[in-house]
Amino acid sequence: MLTARLLTSLFLLPAAAVLAPAAAQDIVPHRAVYAVSALDRGKPGTGTSGTYAFELRLTCDGYVVNQRLRLEMAGARAAVASEQQSQMTESRDGKKLRFEHRTTTGGKQTSIVKGEALVGDDGKGEARFTEPEGQTVALPPNTLFPVAIARETIRQAKAGESGFDAQFFFGEKVKAPQLVNILIGKLPKRLADVKIPEGGEQLADGRTRIYYRAGFFDAQADGKGQGEPAYEMSSVTLDNGIELYGTHEESDGGIEYRITRLEALPKPECK
């Protein structure tokens, strides 16, 4: 799933119910590429196109995620290319996240954010940034990192739940975790025909398609998300963690992406 501002996107459940069962969910290592196009008020638009590449590898201790979003947007004289890259390592128990996020526009780097986030046994944590150096952010109890929230969404869907709320930290900015409101629903007919790319059929055989929408709310002074969401996203994801289709919507605009390539990656040999 796109988990930053463009690489990102109910029923309240007890925090223990959100976190404890997530470890039982496993996802397959894979590499996928998506074609990206513009959305205008939720409908196909013009002026923006690109590609989104996602890779998830398993290690004996956790997960390594690499993702890149490249967009070309129509300008007054010529198209302007922008690129967002993220590299993350997340522990299998969901208590540690190392992150690096880079943004370039027109071939020039415009931002870089790096750091590490740790969650203690009491559920509270802290993110420490090395870029910008010396910055820290407190993490409230039961904050979820990217892989953990994806696994929990799958767990909830397989259990027949309608959705959940969670605190979500990605590390793309020096800011508090966002409140995420996830709604799990019926797969829309218009998305039922999303095809599996040639060569990736074995990864999808016998798998259930999960559809959900998520709203991301910036934290207020009281630590809660309020008002309109900063952005929203939707996704069609297999129950082994492979995303087939997604959207990211902010204000009146946005993007949608549809899978075009899929391949399996090797699993580690762990003792």
Mark where each language-model region is.
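Short, surface-exposed coil-to-beta transition loops
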Residues: 47-52, 81-85, 109-113, 228-232
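Hydrophobic/aromatic-rich structural module bridging two neighboring secondary-structure elements via a short loop
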Residues: 67-121
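Mature, soluble, non-transmembrane domains
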Residues: 102-271
